[in-house]
């Protein structure tokens, strides 16, 4: 009986330790992804293609607010630039080496960009994957929130 009780106590204790480590790992991943998600928005704002190439995978795709699926061609060519880009990650879902981030964005396009000078509110979803030990943005979707 004592052996059974000891086994139960040890099992509960070990399970608690493993869960604690898992929670710490998940918290660290979430913190890293939130940092990268905001860094991505900052690189887009600055038009920093070198930084974006370190964030995006080679096969990165975006379902953009212009109803197109592309490789961020509008950003790469400078057809879309921003005076302001605020991103607020609201939900981070961790599934192994894949993380899905959902939230809202407020952007103000500039120059010859469509809707230049207007404040545009959007919802977004970013999909991050760990590749070769680094978190990279593999896909993104952004939709303009209808104005009333």
Where are these regions (language model features)?
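Bacterial N-terminal signal peptides
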Residues: 5-16
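A beta-strand edge to alpha-helix "cap/lid" segment located at domain peripheries
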Residues: 21-148
């Amino acid at each position: 009986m004592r052996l059974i009780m000891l086994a139960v106590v040890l099992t509960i204790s070990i399970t608690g330790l493993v869960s604690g480590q898992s929670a710490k790992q998940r918290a660290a991943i979430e913190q890293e992804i939130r940092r990268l998600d905001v860094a991505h928005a900052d690189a887009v704002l600055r038009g920093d293609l070198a930084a974006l190439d370190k964030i995006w995978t080679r096969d990165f795709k975006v379902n953009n607010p212009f109803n197109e699926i592309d490789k961020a061609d509008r950003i790469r060519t400078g057809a879309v630039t921003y005076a302001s880009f605020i991103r607020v990650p609201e939900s981070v879902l961790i599934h192994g080496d894949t993380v899905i981030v959902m939230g809202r964005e407020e952007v103000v396009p500039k120059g010859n960009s469509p809707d230049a000078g207007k404040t545009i509110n959007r919802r977004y979803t970013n999909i991050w994957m760990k590749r070769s030990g680094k978190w990279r943005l593999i896909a993104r979707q952004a939709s303009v929130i209808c104005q009333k």
